[in-house]
Amino acid sequence: PQFDEFGVGIIITSYNELQFYLSLFNQQLPIESQFIKQLADSLNAEIVSGTVQNVSDATTWLGYTYLFIRMLRNPVLYSIGVDQLEQDPLLQQHRGNLINSAAIVLEKHGLIKYDRRNGNFQATDLGKIASTYYVSNTTMSTYNRYLKPNAGEMELCNIFCLSEEFKNIVVREEDKLEIAKLLERV
C-alpha cells in the first residue's frame, strides 16, 4: 500500500496449501515488510532517478515505506529496542543507520559514490545500468569480478548464469530432456 495503511492481495496456491493460507487469513496476522532485503537496490534506483541525493533525503524517503510502518508497529521484529523507540519515536537514527549500511554496500559494489562526511550520493555508470535494467547490486558485483574484455561465449554464459536474478528459476520436468541434449553438445 503506497500511501495507505492497508492493501488487497490475491493468493494463488495449490489445494494442499489452502488450509495454511486460510488459517493465516482467519488469525488476521499482519504481513511484515520484506523491503529490507531489497533496500540497497531500491536506494540505488532512487539515487539514479535523482529523488534521493543524500542520507537525509534517503532517511525521509524510507519514512514513506511500508517497512517504516511495520517498524513502528512491531519494533522488536526489526531489532528496535523499546528504549530506542522511546528516545527516537520516528526512528530517524535507525532509518539513517539502515540507509548508511545500504549506501556502503552500493559503494562497495561500485554503483554509487558515497561521501560519508557530508552524506552525499552520486550515481555511477554501473549504478545507472543496474537501475535501468533491474540488475541487483550483488549481480553487478559478480559481473565486475568475473567479466573480462576477452571472455568467450561460454565464459559469458557461465558468468551470466551466476546472476542472482536466476537463482529461483527451476527447470521444468518436461525441459530436462532438452537441456540434457544441449549439455551433450557442449
Feature locations, PLM:
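Conserved segment of the helicase C-terminal RecA-like domain
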Residues: P1-L29
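Low-complexity, interaction-prone regions
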Residues: S14, R185-V186
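C-terminal accessory/connector segments of nucleic-acid motor ATPases
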Residues: F25, L29-I179, E184
